[in-house]
Swiss-Prot record:
Annotated stretches, region: Leucine-zipper: 226-247
Compartments (UniProt record): Nucleus
UniProt cross-references to Gene3D superfamilies, sorted A to Z: Homeodomain-like (1.10.10.60)
Pfam families: HALZ (PF02183), HD-ZIP_N (PF04618), Homeodomain (PF00046)
Protein name from the UniProt record: Homeobox-leucine zipper protein HAT3
GO cellular component, one term: nucleus
Annotated source species: Arabidopsis thaliana
Listed InterPro entries: HD, HD-ZIP_Homeobox_LZ_Class_II, HD-ZIP_N, Homeobox_CS, Homeodomain-like_sf, Leu_zip_homeo
Compositional bias per record (Low complexity), positions renumbered to this chain: 280-305
Function statement: Probable transcription factor.
Family membership: Belongs to the HD-ZIP homeobox family. Class II subfamily.
Length: 315
């Protein structure tokens, strides 16, 4: 122990405690560390009091040093695989340092795929959707490959999908049967397939195709017929339009009817029962000549002399 008097009435004493006889102080180094830390804090307080501009930097350095010490202690303790997912994220971040685990491997793969998708999306936005088109093409190719594999994995599907080659006799029998019956029931299909040495499915498909061809031909014939009808109706319509235009032209020009003679009428005299021709105009009808009469021309309305008929007994 040492004491010091600076002349101001203050005394400073230091005691290390090595001369004490307590064995617990010798085995426990904590009092020494606590004393050193307390003296360090007193020294910092005095220096901060003398230099207030260094307070902030000192506290920052203390916190940084404490963080580094905690990180070092956690690294020395080791990493537990069975920890919460937060430790998995730490493992992924420290992957470059050589620390690996099953969870870290899975998380790193998933994060790599996610970053790849983000990069592809960004490239697609910049390149005007080219990446999306490429992805669509790859998807379609993959789907097409799957369908090809499925088709090829079937038992006998490729052979059944080949075009059926029929002999002349088989084709003739099928045509004759189709003329009689355009559709067949299952029994007829089985009998015909057995007769022609074919499968029932082949006979059914042939009849389906034959009906489709017949319907197509009938549709073509109907189209031709309707086309001819349309042409005839078009010609008839043109002819009628021409006649209508001619009639309208005659109606708009009435002077063409001035030279036509007025219609004549026939009148009968009630006294003589003779027919006289009269006209609607002011002209007088021409006189009627009587060949049996020695008299000259007479008016048609003049009275005619009546002759007596000879009696039957006068002869």
């Amino acid at each position: 122990m040492s004491e010091r008097d600076d002349g101001l009435g203050l005394s400073l004493s230091l005691s290390l405690g090595f001369n004490q006889k307590d064995p617990s102080s010798r085995l426990n180094p904590m009092p020494l560390a606590s004393y050193a830390s307390s003296s360090h804090m007193q020294h910092m307080q005095q220096s901060n009091y003398n230099h207030p501009q260094k307070i902030q930097n000192t506290w920052i350095n203390m916190f940084q040093s404490s963080e580094r010490n905690s990180d070092m202690r956690s690294f020395l303790r080791g990493i537990d695989v069975n920890r919460a997912p937060s430790t998995v994220v730490v493992d992924v971040e420290d992957e470059g340092a050589g620390v690996s685990s099953p969870n870290s491997t899975v998380s790193s793969v998933m994060s790599g795929k996610k970053s790849e998708r983000e990069l592809m999306a960004a490239a697609g936005a910049v390149g005007g959707g080219r990446v999306e088109d490429n992805e669509i093409e790859r998807a379609s190719c993959s789907l097409g490959g799957g369908s090809d594999d499925e088709d090829g994995s079937g038992n006998g599907d490729d052979s059944s999908r080949k075009k059926l080659r029929l002999s002349k006799e088989q084709a003739l029998v099928l045509e004759e049967t189709f003329k009689e019956h355009s559709t067949l029931n299952p029994k007829q299909k089985m009998a015909l397939a057995k007769q022609l040495n074919l499968r029932t499915r082949q006979v059914e498909v042939w009849f389906q195709n034959r009906r489709a061809r017949t319907k197509l031909k009938q549709t073509e014939v109907d189209c031709e017929y309707l086309k001819r009808c349309c042409e005839n109706l078009t010609d008839e319509n043109r002819r009628l339009q021409k006649e209508v235009s001619e009639l309208r032209a005659l109606k708009l020009s009435p002077h063409l009817y001035m030279h036509m003679k007025p219609p004549t009428t026939l009148t009968m005299c009630p006294s003589c029962e003779r027919v006289a021709v009269t006209s609607s105009s002011s002209s007088v009808a021409p006189p009627v000549m009587n060949s049996s009469s020695p008299m000259g021309p007479m008016s048609p309305w003049a009275a005619m002399p009546l002759r007596q008929r000879p009696a039957a007994g006068s002869h």
